[in-house]
A protein has these predicted regions:
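Tandem alpha-helical RNA-recognition repeat domains
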Residues: 8-19, 28-32, 43-63, 75-79, ...
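Inter-helix linker motif
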Residues: 34, 81-82, 117, 132, ...
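Pentatricopeptide repeat
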Residues: 3-8, 12, 23, 38-43, ...
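Alpha-helical solenoid repeat scaffolds, predominantly canonical TPR units
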Residues: 26, 66-69, 73, 109, ...
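Repeat-mediated protein-protein interaction surfaces in helical alpha-solenoids
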Residues: 23, 116-128, 167
Length: 314
C-alpha cells in the first residue's frame, strides 16, 4: 500500500503543473485508501490551488470554484485532529487571497488565526505548546504588501498598529521593525496620493523617535529615506522638490554609509526637478545635484548622467 509520502509526491507533481482536478482526484483516492494526510499533503493541495489560479489568470481563463476549494481544504485541515496547520499553510492562504487582489480577505484570515489561537488557549497568547500556531511577523508583512499593491496605505497602517497592540500584549515576535515601517512608507510612496510625501516623512520621523526611546529594531536605513523621497516625488507640488533636497542633504550629513544617497535617491531628485514648473532653474538644480554627489564621492551611472544632460537642454 502506498505511504503518505508516496501520495504527497503525486500531489506535488500535480501542484507543480497547477492541475487542481488531478490533485483533487489523487486526494480522494488517498483518503479512500485510509491513508491519513499530513500537513505536507494539505499544504501541497492548497499550493496547487494557488498555482492553478495563477495559470488560469495568465491565460485569461475563469478561475472556477478555486476559492471554494481553498476554503474547503483549509476547513478540513482545521477539523483534522491529527494535523496542525503551520506557517507554510498560513502563507499559502495569504498568497492566494493577495493574488486574487483580495487583500481584505487575506487580512481577515490572518486576524482569524489570531482569534482562534487565543480561543484554543483560553484567551491567552502562547508562543509554543499551542493547538494553533501564532502567525509570524513576516505574514503581517505579506498582508501589508498586499495593501501596497492595492494602494491602500491607511489599511497597512492599521495593520501595523495591530502588530504593536499584539506586541504590547506580550507577543514580542510581532513587534514592528525597520522592514515593517519601510513597507508602510513604501505603501504611501506607491499610493500616489497628494498627501503621501507628508505622511511618509511623518513615519520616518516617528521611527527616529522610537529609536531615541530605545527601540533599536526600527532604525532608519537608506530604503526608509528612498521611499520617503519617492513619496514626495509622487506627491507633486512645489514643496516636493524642497523636501527632497532637504532629505538628501540630511542623508549625506548623517555620514552613515548605510544611509548615503544612491542611484535611486539621485534619480528621484532628478525626476522631480524635471517635473518642476518653469520657475525652477533646472540647469542650476542639475549643478546642485552634481555638487551633492561630489560631497560623498558618488559616481553616477549612465542613466543619471543622461538625465542631468537633459536638464541642460530643457
Amino acid at each position: 500500500m502506498p505511504s503518505v509520502r508516496t501520495w504527497n509526491i503525486l500531489l506535488s507533481a500535480y501542484a507543480i503543473q497547477g492541475d487542481i482536478s488531478r490533485a483533487k482526484h489523487c486526494w480522494r483516492r488517498m483518503k479512500k485508501s485510509e491513508i491519513r494526510p499530513d500537513i505536507v499533503s494539505y499544504n501541497t493541495l492548497l499550493n496547487c490551488c494557488v498555482k492553478s489560479f495563477r495559470i488560469r489568470k495568465k491565460r485569461s481563463r475563469n478561475s472556477g470554484n478555486i476559492e471554494e476549494d481553498v476554503e474547503f481544504i483549509f476547513k478540513e485541515l482545521m477539523h483534522d485532529q491529527d494535523v496542525l496547520a503551520n506557517h507554510i499553510t498560513y502563507l499559502t492562504m495569504i498568497n492566494f487571497w493577495i493574488n486574487k487582489k483580495k487583500t481584505k480577505r487575506a487580512e481577515q484570515f490572518l486576524l482569524k488565526v489570531i482569534q482562534e489561537h487565543k480561543k484554543s488557549n483560553n484567551g491567552v497568547m502562547k508562543i509554543s505548546d499551542s493547538k494553533i500556531l501564532f502567525p509570524l511577523r513576516s505574514l503581517f508583512h505579506k498582508v501589508m504588501t498586499g495593501w501596497l499593491i492595492t494602494k491602500k496605505p491607511e489599511n497597512a497602517e492599521q495593520l501595523l498598529l495591530k502588530m504593536t497592540e499584539l506586541s504590547d500584549d506580550g507577543f514580542d515576535g510581532l513587534q514592528p521593525n525597520t522592514e515593517t515601517y519601510n513597507i508602510l512608507i513604501n505603501c504611501w510612496a506607491k499610493s500616489n496620493k497628494w498627501e503621501s510625501g507628508e505622511c511618509a516623512e511623518a513615519i520616518l520621523r516617528g521611527m527616529e523617535g522610537l529609536v531615541s526611546a530605545g527601540k533599536e529594531k526600527v532604525i532608519t536605513n537608506r530604503d526608509s529615506y528612498n521611499f520617503v523621497l519617492e513619496a514626495w516625488s509622487n506627491s507633486g507640488g512645489d514643496i516636493s522638490l524642497i523636501r527632497i533636497e532637504k532629505l538628501i542633504r540630511e542623508m549625506v550629513s548623517l555620514e552613515n554609509p548605510g544611509v548615503l544617497p544612491d542611484s535611486d535617491s539621485y534619480e528621484l531628485w532628478l525626476k522631480t526637478i524635471a517635473a518642476s514648473n518653469g520657475r525652477v532653474d533646472k540647469i542650476q538644480k542639475g549643478k546642485e545635484v552634481i555638487m551633492m554627489m561630489k560631497t560623498h564621492n558618488f559616481c553616477p551611472n549612465g542613466d543619471i548622467r543622461r538625465k542631468i544632460l537633459l536638464l541642460s537642454d530643457s
